[in-house]
Amino acid sequence: MSGIQATDEARETYQKLSRSKIQYVVFKIDKVDGTEVIALDCIGEKVKGDEGQDACWEDFCSKLPENEGRYGVFDLRWTQDDGRKRDSVCFVSWTPDGAKIRQKMMYGATQESFKGSLDGIKSTIVAHDASDLTDERASVLKK
């Protein structure tokens, strides 16, 4: 464990997602007052029903920089072929191939402790490029 803790703002924003107020949250490791912390990067507004889920996922993915790591949490919702409604609060670890080695190590070392501090996570996506995001989301939606 790296010892990097989430800011109060980051934790409070995640609580809004878990109470179905927002669709996704993106976090980044940042320096605040000389200390590395997991901070809020951006949020995505809630979409109603299954409609808009794909567009919202695309918007979420567009917030993940090509050369910097991020964590994300996305409230996935879908209807299965048999008509059953499903949902999964999905943790996303984004460490792109273009990120610096030190940054990849920090995100890797902090991932499990940060994810463990977030109640209600049902699935995890570990992605290094855009195709990983697409493939892993499809895998979650099949479960």
Please give the residue ranges for each predicted region.
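Long, low-complexity regulatory segments enriched in Ser/Thr/Pro/Gly and acidic residues
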Residues: 1-143
